[in-house]
Amino acid sequence: MATTMTKGRRAKGQAVSPARWAMYAGAVFVVAWIATQLFYFAQIAVWNYVNPQSTAFMRSDAWRLSQDRPDQSLQHVWVPYEQISRNLKRAIIASEDANFVNNNGYETDAILQAWERNKARGKIVAGGSTITQQLARNLFLSREKSYIRKGQELIITWMLETLMDKERIFEIYLNSVEWGNGVYGAEAAARYYFRTSAAKLTAGQSARLAVMLPRPKYFDEHRSSGYLTQRARVIARRMGAAELPE
């Protein structure tokens, strides 16, 4: 009996094997990952009917401004889709995602081209992102460039395309995309750069705003950039062919 009790105590005192710990850790990771995806899915479903109050990018910028520029606050005003100039809508589609209305949120050729450029450079320098992919990143993710983040971006893109129509995706994009240092959304950008409303933006103004999107903070500080002016002319010529979601 004494021998049996000794064996029992030894068994209780034995450490859990590394393989079992790995299994436990893997199970916790899978559960956490699934819970995160369900949260994203539910949040997107709600945003079909309720406008997002903020995005991951906005919250990050608001915190940065509170630390670096406490006298400056985030500029953001939501306006309905119908109150945003068709000029701006056409300019953004012409500049960022010419096939927005007809694609499923992905442009395979652009993704493959970005992959080749990244492989050649040995780091992520391009993402081949559509408007829906950009929105996925803005809403939930960070500015970090990694393959893990890109994978999550693609999953959220699928959720957006599954749960929302193109007009709603574009409406949220127009109201949440970054346009400068602490400037978010079409209405805030129109007021900040041109002292007008998003509804009254001209073709020229819209083309400039569209060109700023890939590097909004840079162009906020370099508004007289020759590239900005030249590229805006190109986008202005392409705007007429841009197809809008209706």
Curated annotation (Swiss-Prot):
It is an enzyme of class 2 (transferase). The lineage of its organism: Bacteria, Pseudomonadati, Pseudomonadota, Betaproteobacteria, Burkholderiales. Pathway: Cell wall biogenesis; peptidoglycan biosynthesis. Its main location: membrane. It comes from the Bacteria. The keyword Transmembrane helix applies. Belongs to the glycosyltransferase 51 family. GO terms for molecular function: pentosyltransferase activity; peptidoglycan glycosyltransferase activity. This is Biosynthetic peptidoglycan transglycosylase. Pfam families: Transgly.
